[in-house]
Amino acid sequence: VNKLFPKKHQLYPEDYDMVYEKQYRPSQTRIIDAAAVQTDHDIFKSFQKKECYGMPKPPRNITTLPSTTKVEYSRYMYALANYVKEAEHIEWYAFSRTPRQVAERITDILANAEWAVPSDFSKFDGTISDIVRELERMILRRAFHPSCVAEVLDLHSNQFNKTGLTRFYVKYLSGTSRASGSPETSIFNTIVNAFIAYATWRLSKVDGEYVEPDVAWSKLGVYGGDDGLTPDIDSDMYEKTAKMFGLQLTTETIMRGDLGIVFLSRFYTSDVWFGDPNSCCDLRRQLGKFHTTVKLQGVVPVEKLLEKSRAFYLTDRNSPILGQLVSKAIELNGGAPAMSKHHNLVRFGSDIPVENQFPNEYREDYHAVLDKQLPNIDYELFDTWLASCNNLYSLLSPPLIVEPEVAVTKHETVVDGDVARPIVTSTKLETVAENETNNPTNRPSRVHDARAFVAGRVAIASAHHVRGGVHGGRGTVGDGNVTIPTERQPDQRLGLRRRHRRGRGRGGNGNS
């Protein structure tokens, strides 16, 4: 806290004009206008965000705060964020930089590093603990003038331990978790992110001595939201420190010269260690959802295609597959389209000039990234199809260049009207064997025979695992995960069981 604010009590809340300037989307301006005439209630309202995922997983819960609380708290959070962005001694804050400057910061911190640790917090908002909340209170007390402290602490306390209400009127308690729609989300998540790295260094020993505060501060990398990149930090100690604060951190150690540096979903080349700032997006993730969007009134498919193409043309025109696709769209349109009437709904960063975007000059490593993510892409089929496209509408019907994978889930999940069932891992084979032993229709004579029986079924499943497909009612074998084959049931396809349409799914409130 002292490193963040060498001089205490320097900040005051921003004026209301700043809030109006920053929160210009229609949904945001409605909240601001409501704050002038409404009295706050003490309940959080939430809804599920409409977005694509790479696998079946719980949807993200978006929480909307009472209007007056949000507007007043925004004044303080903008003041805090502006300070962190502008302070010369804070070099690790990613959101104070343009995308190009973020890439340059990465090359700077890797220049003399022996290794680096990309990091990502899981369920960051949902795992904020009491001790993290106390850290935030300490920051607010030191940052703001004494005349403001009581108000900002009161506003801060109104961000958690509240009753929540979903769109379908299911009540829940928020606990100390962070409300996703709170003004504090971006700034505090980033500060907490950097703090965990700082605390890790302070808990580390060099030559038998704990790292001093000044040294720990100087060793910080770059952080933005739940993403981080820290040079030369011990990844085991890093995860252990996060756990001490109730947080879930995933790390990976990348040695100098190796491919694998990732930050803010940008994949950097192996030459980033030697000053090359070029990168590509997470191609698997972006290709998997490029063709999707929420239903927007008055927006037709070709228009959305051009808007997405315009955005990715700025950041990934030289990335394989995706860059080729968006470049073709721009070519067939006769050039990049201007910002449309729906400019406030387009991809984040679309308004940043190309000279300030992430550098994306062509590099062979982009193909290495893509081939690792999607090893069986049919490049020839894609190139042939793309060359045959002579208008924008033809781009809306691409061929299948990668076989789809079977949905892998920890819980029964509805996927396109089917129920995807949990994968049975090899560690559960003994349990499955015991279940088979107790099955009167399929009972081997001994437990040993049951294990052999299950192992045989796994072998059959493995033999029928072709290109990620599922055949004959048998499940998937890959990455150590298996589904025990079963006899095909009526209307059973791809290892998925069709649920009767009139019945409820397993989603909350009867929604699947």
Regions found by a protein language model. Give the residues of each.
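Viral RNA-dependent RNA polymerase
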Residues: 1-511
